[in-house]
Structure formats: C-alpha cells, structure tokens
Amino acid sequence: MHRRGIRLMGELVPYMHGWGEFDGQSWMEIMDLADDYSLLCCYHTPFAFAMGPMLSAHPNVTFVAAHPGDRERVEEHIRLMKQHDNLYLDLSGTGLFRLGVLRHLVTQVGAERILFGTDSPWMDQRHTLDLFLALPLSPEAQARILYQNALELYGLQTWIE
C-alpha cells in the first residue's frame, strides 16, 4: 500500500476494532509497521495517558489525536504534546470551545500542531467554525489551525501552489 501512495491511517479506535487498548500488543504491532513507513496515524482519544509509551516507541509515526474532549483530557494531551513532537491534536467533533480551552491549548503548545476538523465529515462544521472564529486568536494562529498545518502535515501544499 505504501508503494501506491498510502501515507496515513485513521481514525483508529483499537477497542472498537478488536485490537485491545492503546498500549496492547496488537496495537503496538500495527504501530511498528506504521513506524517502518513513517505513516501518519489518526486515532480516537479517550485515554491520552495510555499513549505515552506508543509515542516514544514510534518516533517516525505522526500521531493525530482526534476530538480530544473536555479540559481534563486536553490537559493530558498538552502534557504529551510537550514531551512528543510527533503528536498533533485535531479539534473535530469537540467541545474545546467551552471555557477557553482552545486558547489555553494554543498558549501551552502553540498553534503549529493543532488541526481543525480533519476527522469530521459526520457533522456540520459551520457552527464549530463560527465558534472558532469568535475566539481571541491571532490571524496567524487561526490560519495555522484552519488550514496551514493540514496542508503541511498531509503534504498538500504542492496541490494548491
């Protein structure tokens, strides 16, 4: 598949796919292959704390944590993002716009590893976009999160240049 241009996997939800938990052996074997090919992996984020060993063991995989949820879970991701440069966060389908959580996230880790809605074809993004645009973020941070990070991460810059 890699020879045919496949560069990413996701959204992976190990406990739904029958692979056990994020730190289980089946999941590790899949990520070992992803690491061999430097793939991007989007995964469901119920338990960020279980991802630390996975992130450390697979430095060639770019992990995208989708819809990180409430402030407590976001704090777990912030801690991991500060330790692992190969972790990004996707805002799709999330309540991050409540209580200044997104602004806190940007303050803590910067806008360079945050994506807007790349894992969310199942819901109308107009309302989420309106909420996002109302946040007190710089135009540069908005641009990074809304499209620039995705263009770079998914290698799409050349498609629009």
List the model feature ranges, each with a label.
Residues 117-121, 125:
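C-terminal active-site rim and adjoining tail of enzyme catalytic domains
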Residues 14, 47, 145:
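Residue-level "edge-of-site" marker
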Residues 4-5, 84-85, 146:
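Active-site gating loops and adjacent loop-to-helix segments of metal-dependent hydrolytic enzymes
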Residues 8, 21-115, 160:
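Catalytic pocket-lining loop regions of alpha/beta-barrel enzymes
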Residues 1, 9, 34, 67, ...:
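Conserved, mostly hydrophobic/aromatic
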Residues 111-113, 126-161:
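Mid-to-C-terminal alpha-helical segments outside catalytic/metal-binding sites
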